Amino acid sequence: LCTAPIHKKALQDGAGFAYPGHTEYLQALAGADRAVMMLASEQLRVVPTTIHIALRDVPKMLTPALLRDTIRITAEGLRQQFGIAQPRIAVAGLNPAEGYALRGPLPADTMFHATARASYDAAVCMYHDQALIPIKTLDFDRGVNVTLGLPFIRTSPDHGTAFDIAGTGVANPSSMIEALRMAHRMANP
């Protein structure tokens, strides 16, 4: 299933749609416990543990159970949807310089360098911007949103409706095209 961008507020306010977006709706339809957003490109795959909350709220939202669940769903998605038998997952720290001697969490300011990216298959990040800034910097026009945790493949372009450029002839279809291609590759390993 490859979905196109939707205007969430218009659906909720104008049509009475009871869900924040596609992901939550598909999760409910599928009876899935939790769906996780992965942004993927040829260069990088990232998964934010928390999404669409204020940065000041991230520390209180992060729990060992939430992080464990995010990592589990990411690993399952890498195996089932990307064909990676033994997924290597990097975990970004919220405050990695706190002084603990750990291999991970990794400092987000260096974990996205090309050499570091070669050592893992996906990065689990603590919050939305920590995950999205590197992928949009590396591959802005070809990023794909992959929903993990559903019993079927779901992709979508990594952008919104872009009403501000509708009808101007400047919209770039690359992310939608890549979302269709990635769904096809995932369905035909």
Q: In which residue ranges do the predicted regions lie?
A:
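Anion-binding alpha/beta catalytic cores of soluble intermediary-metabolism enzymes, centered on
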Residues: 1-189
